[in-house]
From Swiss-Prot:
It catalyses: S-adenosyl-L-homocysteine + H2O = S-(5-deoxy-D-ribos-5-yl)-L-homocysteine + adenine; S-methyl-5'-thioadenosine + H2O = 5-(methylsulfanyl)-D-ribose + adenine; 5'-deoxyadenosine + H2O = 5-deoxy-D-ribose + adenine. Pathway: Amino-acid biosynthesis; L-methionine biosynthesis via salvage pathway; S-methyl-5-thio-alpha-D-ribose 1-phosphate from S-methyl-5'-thioadenosine (hydrolase route): step 1/2. InterPro entries: MTA_SAH_Nsdase, Nucleoside_phosphorylase_d, Nucleoside_phosphorylase_sf. This is 5'-methylthioadenosine/S-adenosylhomocysteine nucleosidase. NCBIfam families: MTA_SAH-Nsdase (TIGR01704), PRK05584.1 (NF004079). Belongs to the PNP/UDP phosphorylase family. MtnN subfamily.
């Protein structure tokens, strides 16, 4: 089994990259993919860059060149669920775009033309993540993660997203694009991110302060998932 792991930023991948044994690096179109093993599991770790286009391009390169059996999208997110605080975990049931709008043609808010309204995470991978959350005794929410090419920092965009997607648990800038590409390739995926900020008018300051915390927590989760997969063989 080979596991694809995707993070957008250097801070989101560095702790995992440092663990990779027999590491080799593939550089293509601004993306970096690190291949090797973590705890005996074959991995391909992508640093995609920030935003939907970078995430989509990087995920495509990862799936084409490395052919992982599954994908885990890791990193940080802004928490919208009321129970989430910095360092907590959010696990995707599904991912949607919050900045796509072709409703004039009968599509749902966030739905791209010709695509499903949401990209649904793999049930077995959700269960794997939840078992690791229980094992690590972490606080977590499972639900909808919304993505867009904007850092949500202010009352107006926050209110718009909550009004359009009332059950949204977290927001960030890549997960829906990752899910979109995995859907097209037929590759199972799950998003497992740690909260770096609670999306509000001060979230930019919280993000800068707590990104390191989120990176450590999301890495902890990915490691636990890899360890469980290694035990299963």
């Amino acid at each position: 089994m080979k596991v694809g792991i995707i993070g957008a930023m250097e801070q989101e991948v560095t702790l995992l990259r440092d663990q990779i044994e027999n590491r080799q690096t593939i550089q293509r179109a601004g993306c970096e993919i690190y291949t090797g093993q973590i705890g005996g599991v074959d991995v391909a770790l992508l640093k995609s860059g920030i935003g939907k286009v970078s995430a989509a391009m990087g995920t495509t390169l990862l799936l084409e060149h490395c052919k992982p059996d599954l994908v885990i999208n890791t990193g940080s997110a802004g928490g919208l669920a009321s129970t989430l605080k910095v360092g907590d975990i959010v696990v995707s049931e599904e991912v949607r775009y919050h900045d796509a709008d072709v409703t004039a043609f009968g599509y749902e808010p966030g739905q791209m033309a010709g695509c499903p309204a949401a990209f649904v995470a793999d049930d077995a991978l959700i269960a794997l993540a939840e078992s690791c959350i229980k094992q690590l005794n972490l606080n977590a929410v499972r639900g909808l993660i919304c993505s867009g090419d904007a850092f949500i920092n202010g009352a107006e965009p926050l209110a718009r997203i909550r009004a359009t997607f009332p059950n949204v648990a977290a927001v960030e800038m890549e997960a829906a694009a990752v899910g979109h590409v995995c859907h097209l390739f037929g590759t199972p995926f799950v998003v497992v991110r740690a909260i770096s900020d609670v999306a509000d008018s001060e979230s930019h300051m919280s993000f800068e302060e707590f990104l390191v915390v989120a990176a450590k927590q999301s890495t902890l989760m990915v490691n636990a998932m890899l360890q469980t997969l290694a035990k299963r063989g």
